[in-house]
């Protein structure tokens, strides 16, 4: 006889009737699934003395193992069974408990912020508890339940004890963010804001980044997904940057490091008293700082480091991530962003040389690189002609070929087009230039190096993210409401969170920069009858992202009318009366595939912004959504899926995830490796960039088997790089190569794709 150990420690014989009842409940109302298949799959794992929790895990695993392109609905079965386990683990029963008593209990445990009981009365908490919809737990797919249990639900990360369920998470996040909302502000009461925010998040219209999902409602208050830190060219400045990195990595943030100011190897120090050791030793120092903390058990530390392509050490910097070389001349655990501008591309196209300098030797050149392209070119030519300045001249095609080879071989050498970042950005580069991006290449905010650790005159940029789930929108008009809650919540978060450094707090509260993007674009295209490669869907993309930018600006203007414009609004192009529709890359207008009429009432909005200003300096950025897309059961960000079923590899094991509405849309989806090239995808990225005031985590993808000798020609890589630049794309993120990774004997790679875990902004950034 097999005996089962109950939660209270007592034992009882395995009840076949109870066992089958749970299985039947798991499949009830779900089409094209078999209760007997789930029961039989789990039966092989049953053993004498197993706990009820282990028994339930066996049922979940059995259902999850049955997920396939032919039987995608087992994802719902596995999700339902796993959600049952989550709620039993959290509450000891399936039903949600009293919301008030739940909060009191978790505040006393020290896992919830005690302000919840200070800012809300018992009656208000009871009202919000009644508003919670436990049935919305049924909306989660299996991958979502795994992520919730491992990453997002508040828990003891040593014992694994879970303290809450998903609907409480969504309500509590809203309660924390709007605890200081004044009744009547922007025409809404505080409880209306909390309830409205709960509705748009718990129904997946708005996707939240990992730091907010995992952290808001806990005593830890740092939720910006990514942090941008620029290093000064001095020992004190480098030390200050390193200190800031450690501070923020320990608070769940990914890091963007700007080190382009650092002088090159062999430069004089103190008028020749010493010789500079070059950039690489300091990059190793930054790498150690990044890897010093594990981000509270939620994410591993990660950073992208930025430098200009004309830096004197560029030939050594480009190869830092590859597997050749020795430990002394490699810094492999950082990613890299190579910053390029118009003149560098022109030298490439004209088959000319690029001259490399140490920034310290060419006064004004580094700053002009971002602020004024004409001034940069004049200074660059002047310094090229000055024989007294140390320099090196290399063929542009050789330098760019090395760049693209390293990008292809590592996948994680990124591109930042700094002229586009500043000319088609939210800020006036003369007063607030953008010097770098972030970990995942979607954030373009001003930074200023810290001269010393507590330098309040420095500027550390923080990006605060969320994403619209395009698949949940029945019409573009719905964006108005969702955009308002998104902007209001993220704006409130800027005041709610703590800041370890004045150099972050002062600009964060003065600029109030936000980055709202989208997830589920692949599903959105498919359900509307379009795909990535066909330009027929370009007009839909144009109309959708025009509406997104418009409604976000509208929401920020409404908040500015109610609360006041952000303090440094004058440093934006918006303050000069300019909108994204005024300064985008005009090459888009020359192509009928990318030139479409505007549909929104922009001039009326321009007038309101002129009158009230904006609450936020930036509103949009397109981040990766690998993790949060699993929560909302959506395709990742703007990316094409790799197959109808993705096998997500994480620290908690393998999880299968089916694309939305696969049965109905299986012939409409265009999968990553079915795209003939990058042109259709990059064109849609360019259309999105037309409206977005920050940048886009855009990837390039290559299948070597499409080319002679199974090798992607260098000319193809350079063509795509130039095409992206010509279309106004600000940044390029991953370079993905199809190499058969994850292929198993029983899997067709076109159907099942293995997605490896990544260091990430998580997004949020990845969100």
Name what the model sees in each region.
Residues 319, 328, 332-403, 407-410, ...:
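Polar, glycine-rich mid-to-C-terminal structural blocks
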Residues 41-42, 60-62, 77-84, 214-218, ...:
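A glycine-rich phosphate-binding loop feature that marks nucleotide/adenosyl-phosphate handling sites
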Residues 119, 124-148, 435, 441-447, ...:
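Catalytic alpha/beta core of large soluble enzyme barrels
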Residues 74-107, 340-342, 421-452, 514, ...:
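Terminal amphipathic helices with adjacent charged low-complexity linkers/tails
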Residues 7-14, 161-164, 184-192, 212-218, ...:
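Alpha-helix capping and helix-loop boundary segments enriched in small/acidic/polar residues
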Residues 200, 218, 483-505, 531-625, ...:
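Internal maturation/activation junctions in enzymes
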Residues 10, 33-171, 175, 188-198:
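Core nucleic-acid recognition elements
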Residues 154, 161, 168-186, 190, ...:
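Function-dense linear segments that define catalytic or interfacial modules
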């Amino acid at each position: 006889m097999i005996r089962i150990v109950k939660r209270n420690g007592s034992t009882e014989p395995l009840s076949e009737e109870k066992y089958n009842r749970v299985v039947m409940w798991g499949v009830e109302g779900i089409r094209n699934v078999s209760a007997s298949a789930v029961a039989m799959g789990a039966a092989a794992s049953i053993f004498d003395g197993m706990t009820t929790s282990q028994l339930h895990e066996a049922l979940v695993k059995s259902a999850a193992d049955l997920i396939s392109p032919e039987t995608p609905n087992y994802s719902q079965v596995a999700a339902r069974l796993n959600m049952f386990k989550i709620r039993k683990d959290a509450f000891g029963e399936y039903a949600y408990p009293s919301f008030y008593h739940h909060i009191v209990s978790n505040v006393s445990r020290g896992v919830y912020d005690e302000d919840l009981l200070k800012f809300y009365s018992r009656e208000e908490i009871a009202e919000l508890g009644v508003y919670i919809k436990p049935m919305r737990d049924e909306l989660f797919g299996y991958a979502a339940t795994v992520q919730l249990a491992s990453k997002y639900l508040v828990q003891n990360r040593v014992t694994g004890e879970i303290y809450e369920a998903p609907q409480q998470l969504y309500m509590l996040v809203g309660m924390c963010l709007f605890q200081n909302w004044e009744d009547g502000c922007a025409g809404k009461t505080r409880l209306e804001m909390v309830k409205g925010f709960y509705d748009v998040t718990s129904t997946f219209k708005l996707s939240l980044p990992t730091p907010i999902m995992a952290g808001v409602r806990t005593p830890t208050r740092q939720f910006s997904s990514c942090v941008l830190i620029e290093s000064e060219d001095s020992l004190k400045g480098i030390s200050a940057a390193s200190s800031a990195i450690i501070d923020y990595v320990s608070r769940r943030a990914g890091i963007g490091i700007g080190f382009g100011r650092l002088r090159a190897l062999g430069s004089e120090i103190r008028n020749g008293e010493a010789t500079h050791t070059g950039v690489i030793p300091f990059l190793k120092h930054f790498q150690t700082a990044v890897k010093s903390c594990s981000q509270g058990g939620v994410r591993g530390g990660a950073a992208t480091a930025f430098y200009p392509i004309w830096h004197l050490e560029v030939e050594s910097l480009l190869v830092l991530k590859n597997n050749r070389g020795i430990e002394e001349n490699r810094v492999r655990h950082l990613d890299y962003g190579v910053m390029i501008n118009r003149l560098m591309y022109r030298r490439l196209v004209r088959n000319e040389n690029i001259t490399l300098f140490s920034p310290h030797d060419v006064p004004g050149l580094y700053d002009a690189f971002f602020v004024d392209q004409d001034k940069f070119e004049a200074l660059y030519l002047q310094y090229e002609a000055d024989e007294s300045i140390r320099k090196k001249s290399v063929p542009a095609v050789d330098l760019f070929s090395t760049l693209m080879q390293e990008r292809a071989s590592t996948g994680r050498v990124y591109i930042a087009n700094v002229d586009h970042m500043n000319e088609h950005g939210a800020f006036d580069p003369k007063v607030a230039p953008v010097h770098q991006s972030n970990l995942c290449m979607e954030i373009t905010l001003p930074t200023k190096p810290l001269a010393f650790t507590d330098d309040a005159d420095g500027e550390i940029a923080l990006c605060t993210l969320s994403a619209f789930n395009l698949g949940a929108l029945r019409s573009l008009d719905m964006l108005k409401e969702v955009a308002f809650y998104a902007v209001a919540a993220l704006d409130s978060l800027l005041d709610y969170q703590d800041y370890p450094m004045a150099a972050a707090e002062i600009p964060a509260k003065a600029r109030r920069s936000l980055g709202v993007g989208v997830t589920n674009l692949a599903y959105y295209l498919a359900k509307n009858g379009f795909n990535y490669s066909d330009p027929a869907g370009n007009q839909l993309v144009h109309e959708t992202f025009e509406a997104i930018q418009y409604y976000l600006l509208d929401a920020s203007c409404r908040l500015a009318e109610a609360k006041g414009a952000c303090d440094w609004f004058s440093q934006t192009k918006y303050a000069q009366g300019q909108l994204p529709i005024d300064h985008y890359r005009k090459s888009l207008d020359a192509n009928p595939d990318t030139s479409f009429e505007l549909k929104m009432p922009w001039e009326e909005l321009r007038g309101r912004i002129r009158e009230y200003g904006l609450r936020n300096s930036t509103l949009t950025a397109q981040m990766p959504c690998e993790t949060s897309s699993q929560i909302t059961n959506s395709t990742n960000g703007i990316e094409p899926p790799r197959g109808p079923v993705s096998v997500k590899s994480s620290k908690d094991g393998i999880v299968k995830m089916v694309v939305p509405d696969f049965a109905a849309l299986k012939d409409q989806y265009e999968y990553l490796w079915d795209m003939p090239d990058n042109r259709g995808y990059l064109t849609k990225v360019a259309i999105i960039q037309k409206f977005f005031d920050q940048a886009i985590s855009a990837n390039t993808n290559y299948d070597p088997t499409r080319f002679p000798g199974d090798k992607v020609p260098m000319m193809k890589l350079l063509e795509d790089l130039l095409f992206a630049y010509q279309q106004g794309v600000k940044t390029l993120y991953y370079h993905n190569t199809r190499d058969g990774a994850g292929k198993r004997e029983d899997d067709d790679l076109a159907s099942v794709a293995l997605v490896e875990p990544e260091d990430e902004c998580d997004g949020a950034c990845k969100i």
